[in-house]
């Protein structure tokens, strides 16, 4: 098992997919583009910003599925693709999981390409008539990438699997009394609101 980690930006997902720090900057749901950190570096970043969660690479990869980002597909390229075996993937029109296409699966809609049906040319026309979009299998596979559902990730379980205990985030000290003043008459603390009123204890006027 490797001792490498992804850093998840836990503030938001894209659809159901978790987002990770991208190699070279930014964020990505593509695990092949996600930056991998050594344990010490991952923990240090978490200490700087607790929404950057370290995840063991092996743990995440074991739960990965295959998604296809519609932003990297064009109909003209697909039509020009040499689809030798005639097999196609069947996508729901105008339905996405984040940016990923949603496919006709054996058990219903799925954004996991591994669960998508891929009929031959003889059956393709029937799906087209039902309003589905057809994409050549080879073309789609070349543009697919590994992603992971955020809901499948259990942070405590993941950290236990590699014996990592994260330090508790340092909380700034409370300064609840920093906006309080002392009464000129009796010396009691006054809130910012009370300073504009007569002291509730001695009646002295403290307004500036």
Region roles according to the model:
Residues 9, 23, 30, 34-38, ...:
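Membrane-topology and secretion signals of cell-surface/extracellular proteins
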Residues 45-75, 126-174:
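Short, mixed-charge low-complexity intrinsically disordered segments
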Residues 193-207:
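Cysteine-rich micro-motifs
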Residues 177-183, 195-196:
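Residues immediately within or flanking Cys/His clusters that coordinate Zn2+
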Residues 90, 173-174, 197-201:
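Compositionally biased, non-globular sequence tracts
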Residues 2-29, 87-112:
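Short aromatic-glycine-(Arg/Gly/Cys) micro-motifs in beta-strand/loop hairpins
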Residues 182-188, 200-204:
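Short, cysteine/histidine-rich loop/knuckle motifs that typically chelate Zn2+
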Residues 26-53, 106-139, 198:
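A short, charged, amphipathic alpha-helix used as a generic interaction element across diverse proteins
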């Amino acid at each position: 098992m490797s001792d490498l980690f992804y850093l998840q930006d836990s503030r938001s997902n894209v659809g159901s997919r978790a987002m990770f720090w991208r190699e070279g900057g930014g964020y990505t749901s593509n695990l092949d583009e996600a930056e991998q950190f050594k344990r010490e570096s991952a923990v240090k970043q978490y200490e700087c910003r607790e929404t950057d969660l370290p995840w063991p690479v092996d743990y995440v990869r074991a739960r990965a599925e295959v998604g296809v980002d519609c932003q990297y597909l064009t109909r003209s390229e697909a039509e020009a693709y040499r689809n030798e075996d005639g097999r196609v993937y069947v996508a729901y029109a105008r339905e996405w999981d984040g940016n990923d296409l949603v496919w006709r699966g054996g058990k219903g809609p799925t954004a996991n390409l591994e669960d998508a049906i891929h009929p031959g040319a003889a059956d393709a026309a029937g799906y087209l008539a039902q309003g589905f979009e057809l994409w050549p299998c080879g073309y789609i596979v070349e543009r697919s990438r590994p992603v992971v559902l955020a809901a499948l990730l259990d942070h405590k379980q993941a950290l236990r699997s590699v014996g990592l205990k994260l330090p508790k985030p340092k909380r700034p000290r409370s300064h609840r009394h920093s906006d309080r003043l002392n009464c000129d008459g009796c010396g009691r603390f006054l809130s910012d609101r009370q300073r504009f009123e007569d002291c509730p204890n001695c009646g002295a006027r403290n307004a500036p």
